[in-house]
Amino acid sequence: MKTSIGLSLLLAALILMPLAISPALAGCGDPPGPGVDWRNCNLSRQEMSKADLTKATLWRTSFNRSTLTDANLSGADANRSMFLETKMAGATLDGGRFTYADFSRADLTGASLKGANLSRARFHNAILREADLTGADIRDADFFRADLSGALWIDGKKRCGEDSVGACR
C-alpha cells in the first residue's frame, strides 16, 4: 500500500514538475500597461484608446477591429501581430518591432512610426495619412493601395503627395 502511494506521489511530481519550471504564460486578461505580456492573445474588438503599451510583448497577438487611438506602443515587440481594421489614429509606435505584422485596412492617420521595424509588414488598404515614418525600416513592407498622403517618409524630409496610394510620390 505504501509503495503504491509513494509511486503515485512520484508520478504526480514528475508530471507537475515541468509546469513549475516552464516560463510564465502570457496574461491575456491582464490590464493594459507598460511591459504587459500579451503574446499569442486574442484582443480583437477591444477599446484601448490612449493605452500605454510601451515595451509590451505582443507577439502574434490579434488586435483586429480594436481601437488603439492615441495608444503608445513605443518599443513594443509585436512581430507577426494582426491589426486588421484597427483604429490607430494618433498612435505612437516609435522604435517598436512590427516585422510581419498585418495592418491591412487599419487607420494610422497621424500615427508616429519613427524608427519602427516594419520589415515585411502588410499595409493593404491602410490609411497612413500624415503618419511619420522617419527612420522606419520598411524593407519588403507591402503598401498595396495604402493611403500615404501627407506622410513624412523614412528619410524624415520627403512629404508624400496627395496622390500617394501604394507608394510615396
Which residues does each predicted region cover?
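C-terminal segment of classical bacterial N-terminal signal peptides
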Residues: 14-24
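Bacterial N-terminal signal peptides that target proteins for export
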Residues: 1-10
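Intrinsically disordered and other compositionally biased segments
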Residues: 6-7, 19, 91, 121
